[in-house]
Amino acid sequence: MLLLLLLIVVTTLYIFAKLHYTKWERLGFESDKATIPLGSMAKVFHKERPFGLVMSDIYDKCHEKVVGIYLFFKPALLVRDAELARQILTTDFNSFHDRGLYVDEKNDPMSANLFVMEGQSWRTLRMKLAPSFSSGKLKGMFETVDDVAAKLLNHLNERLKDGQSHVLEIKSILTTYAVDIIGSVIFGLEIDSFTHPDNEFRVLSDRLFNPKKSTMLQRFRNLSNFICPPLAKLLSRLGAKDPITYRLRDIVKRTIEFREEKGVVRKDLLQLFIQLRNTGKISDDNDKLWHDVESTAENLKAMSIDMIASNSFLFYIAGSETTAATTSFTIYELAMYPEILKKAQSEVDECLQRHGLKPQGRLTYEAIQDMKYLDLCVMETTRKYPGLPFLNRKCTQDFQVPDTKLTIPKETGIIISLLGIHRDPQYFPQPEDYRPERFADESKDYDPAAYMPFGEGPRHCIAQRMGVMNSKVALAKILANFNIQPMPRQEVEFKFHSAPVLVPVNGLNVGLSKRW
């Protein structure tokens, strides 16, 4: 009797699982072959391949505009068509306005940042933060960025002081550069991780991006943020919160208290957050921007310490990795394309001369803006190596796929494989080649609808211009002062990483030598 009961239970579960994992086929969608209970995530679960590459693999092997996938037990849809992807992000934004990620503003305020917030809360915060990254604000922060770039230059000069060519792992060096920019511009800290790598902020950064130093519960909780937000909310309320985020909150709190107590004012993003907290808005008047810190009782809650900390943490996560990756991948590709390297280096030299600047001296915002070919290089790098290899959205109302009879059900998770689209030859001819000229006005050779490394529409990356500026500053410093040694062309291999970024298996090793 017991054996029969067990057989009935197992059979019932099997039938239920088969029905669950054939949902998309029954609804008429092309579907990735799913395994029970891992769905499309077997290689992710076994740490064989990162999630972004798994989505790109499915993109490559399937054929229809929309493909059914299973994120473990969660049915979702992968969009394989650039026009449809852009439509979801822009014209039909009202049907896909949320990301569907974990957020719990009330009980876990450090989870409530611009990236994950939903509905009116997101709209209000986006509107308030938008002025933070205007041209005037970036120009005001430029000196701080240039100070960090000078430390990068000093570090490289010290590593190459014997005048010989040396192979350096450039990604780790540029990660230090990016982290110090974030620490200074966003957290308001005076740090030099090149000289003092054991400072509190750098140590927290290493722990954050090194999953080996997190517990199994933390890793499971981080995965549930994306796969199953209700479970993440439950785990959070049971105490499974990331201690690093709260350590960073303490840093923000101490810095704000110090500034307000001592009357310290700096031209950085934290100062803008303080202004938003105290006045309810960020001024558009550049002359008053950094000094308008008077507060009123009703506006003190406009941006709490927790909200400042959570959004600082967001810009830290997004800004440090994307800046380091974009800059290092650009250097790596230039080493494999000497003719492109020569053109980029010549432009930097000419711009410095035109603006009356010296290679080892200070840069200016205007000079960086004048480096147009460097812009093309950054565009090509972010095409081939998007900072986030995929975008995600949640369908908030039933949506009919254009020119089909297919309907995307409400609450369905949507994945857009940027890596797949950006390396699709129908949108970008010869996608494996590094060709900055494909973006030049006079020789455009790509489908503009398919290029979206920072997202598109109302939820596009708010700090896009800052990230590009930070990368261009580092590139200009390196190209102006060092020779990059040519090397054979070879595609980068990526290893498994729990973070949704592209991590090279063996780093990015490039030969550098002094020019002067």
From Swiss-Prot:
EC number of the protein: 1.14.-.-
Keyword Iron: yes
Cofactor: heme
GO molecular function, one term: oxidoreductase activity, acting on paired donors, with incorporation or reduction of molecular oxygen
Alphabetically ordered keywords of this record: Endoplasmic reticulum, Heme, Iron, Membrane, Metal-binding, Microsome, Monooxygenase, Oxidoreductase
SUPFAM superfamilies assigned to the protein according to its UniProt record, in alphabetical order: Cytochrome P450
Pfam family, one: p450
Expression induction or repression: By phenobarbital in susceptible strains (3-fold in CS), but not in the LPR strain.
InterPro entries: Cyt_P450 (IPR001128), Cyt_P450_CS (IPR017972), Cyt_P450_E_grp-I (IPR002401), Cyt_P450_sf (IPR036396), Insect_CytP450_Detox (IPR050476)
Effect of R266P: In allele CYP6D1v3
GO CC terms of this entry: endoplasmic reticulum membrane
Location within or outside the cell: Endoplasmic reticulum membrane; Microsome membrane
Membrane topology note: Peripheral membrane protein
Source species, domain of life: Eukaryota
Residues that, per the record, bind heme: C461
Function description: Metabolizes pyrethroid insecticides and other xenobiotics.
Family: Belongs to the cytochrome P450 family.
Further remark: Expressed at higher levels in LPR compared to susceptible flies, it is responsible for monooxygenase-mediated pyrethroid resistance.
Protein's name according to its UniProt entry: Cytochrome P450 6d1
